[in-house]
Amino acid sequence: MKQVDCIGLYCPEPVFRARKAMEESEVGEIIEILADDPAAESDIPVLVKKLGQELVEFEKLEDGVLRFVVKIVKEVR
């Protein structure tokens, strides 16, 4: 599983990094995105949907860290 660590980064950087990871991934790959910017809770799911990918898991971890698990279901250009 590829991990995108956006802890300590604020909008729009987590979205930029998540998008780049999705663009560089192959169909079928799983990406874990970690962020602690509260805006990411809404921004990342919107990005995933916009790019046609699948958000398979979301959870709030300790210390305000948000964890998103995304499955790449189609190529992103």
From Swiss-Prot:
UniProt superkingdom: Archaea
InterPro entries (alphabetical): TusA-like, TusA-like_sf
Active site positions: C11 (cysteine persulfide intermediate)
SS bond list: none
Any matching Pfam family: TusA
Gene3D superfamilies noted in UniProt: TusA-like domain (3.30.110.40)
PANTHER family per the UniProt record, alphabetical: SULFUR CARRIER PROTEIN YEDF-RELATED
The family this protein is said to belong to: Belongs to the sulfur carrier protein TusA family.
Annotated protein name in UniProt: Putative sulfur carrier protein AF_0188
Species: Archaeoglobus fulgidus (strain ATCC 49558 / DSM 4304 / JCM 9628 / NBRC 100126 / VC-16)
